[in-house]
Amino acid sequence: KRKDLYTHAFIIFACAHYWAKVREPLVESVLDAALAVVAERFATGDGLYEAVLERNWSSLKSGPLQNPLMHLAEGFLATLAVREDAITQDALLDLATALQKRFIDRQHGVMMEKPLGAVDNWFEPGHQFEWFFLLDSSEVLRGTPLHASLTRAFAYAELKGVDKLSGAVSGMLALDGSVRDGTQRIWAQAEYLRALTLRPGSEAVLQRQLLALQQNFLHEKGWHECLDAKGAVSRRDMPSTTPYHLATCYQGLIQHLG
């Protein structure tokens, strides 16, 4: 019953894409309402947003978290792709500035999962790749300090979090690059593959990752959600969050391959 920023971010994302297709006023009104709720209820006044609120919209003092903020940025970008919207563009740029200040490790440029200084913090290679794609493919965000950071983060995440032989992407890393969770998740594989389409000189790696996704994760009845660190299937259900990652990955590949 709690109010999640993650959910509202995807409402914005979905409405923007749907409105682009149908141009129905009702759809745009839902988009506007979702944007207003985020601005009025979740915003903390410093460019960031609470990750979760109580069911009555009161604060839980949970603070901001990386993942819902990334999907909010994605929702803002989807909105700007279908209409001119100065308020949303300002919110997006303020978010990017605040993330650079509060979430980016200065040494490696990586986007941490929790704000800098939080206890038991970590970073996920998959999220570095996902952020890189969003930033590098956006005219609004390309060239910002956050874009420069995630360009560095891509290289560090690739070095420490991707197996050069199998193409496996590790789940969670400590800041020093040591593996905290070696679980291979299909969404991280898809995000790495999509991000590679924007990296010059990555054709050989792109082909390797395409094969790795096909051979290790996809099968005739769907997909393997997770493999363990040794490559054995560790999760057999197929959650509804995954097709979004696969669809956006395939879309990126289609644009890259023409």
What function would you assign to each model-found segment?
Residues K1-G258:
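Glycan-recognition and catalytic cores of secretory/periplasmic carbohydrate-active enzymes
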